[in-house]
């Protein structure tokens, strides 16, 4: 890890994250707050944005953050377009073996395909060990289609949006204006984001605030180890 350390903060169950960031220095525009989802972001922003005439920090979900830091000059395929490209990539013998007659037969299969290779990539996994017998045929078909799909993408300069989360597409220019990045109740950090945080620590202050007991989160490996539930009074 980098010489600079992540600052970890923990709050109790029932407490508000926004109440932890009430100081003037918490509300400067050089702060970037990142959230796991829109619900958490909306609650936080509603409480923090008191003075509409002053400059504010930036508030983004992790999905919005990803769209700004992973940049490629390739043609990015989203939603139905990436599934259509997948369909065109399926070798004829595979279509026959799987009884694929139309685009609509493979929508779920295609989404699983993109999700599988995304997980492999963001967690830096080269190969899956201990595959069950019933899984072997699926991985066989995935590998066959992947070979064909890669050729199509190379020919037309395509990339599915699922696969943009790659360190080779990571761009720091947009982040230059921020001095501090705060991850608000973000509890999952795939390998690629550990690398990105390590890179950002060279120039920025990084803070992670979680609604957990101190000791429940592995601060070295950035993952939950256990969950300590709050004590409740026995009913009378």
Describe the residue ranges of each PLM region.
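Conserved RecA-like ASCE P-loop NTPase motor core of nucleic-acid helicases/translocases
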Residues: 28-41
């Amino acid at each position: 890890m980098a010489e600079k350390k992540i600052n970890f903060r923990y709050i109790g169950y029932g407490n508000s994250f926004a109440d932890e960031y009430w100081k003037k220095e918490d509300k400067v525009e050089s702060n970037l707050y990142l959230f796991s989802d829109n619900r958490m972001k909306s609650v936080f922003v509603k409480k923090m944005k008191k003075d509409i005439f002053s400059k504010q920090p930036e508030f983004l979900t992790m999905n919005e953050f990803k769209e700004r830091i992973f940049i490629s000059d390739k043609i990015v395929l989203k939603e139905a377009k990436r599934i259509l490209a997948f369909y065109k990539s399926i070798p004829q013998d595979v279509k026959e073996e799987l009884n694929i007659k139309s685009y609509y037969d493979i929508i779920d299969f295609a989404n699983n395909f993109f999700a599988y290779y995304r997980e492999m990539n963001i967690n830096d996994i080269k190969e899956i060990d201990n595959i069950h017998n019933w899984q072997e045929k699926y991985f066989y078909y995935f590998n066959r289609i992947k070979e064909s799909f890669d050729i199509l993408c190379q020919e037309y300069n395509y990339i599915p949006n699922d696969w943009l989360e790659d360190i080779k597409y990571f761009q720091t220019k947009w982040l230059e204006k921020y001095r501090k990045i705060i991850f608000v109740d973000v509890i999952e950090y795939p390998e690629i984001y550990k690398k990105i945080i390590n890179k950002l620590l060279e120039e920025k202050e990084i803070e992670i605030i979680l609604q957990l007991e101190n000791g429940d989160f592995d601060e070295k490996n950035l993952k939950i180890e256990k969950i300590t539930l709050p004590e409740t009074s026995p009913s009378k």
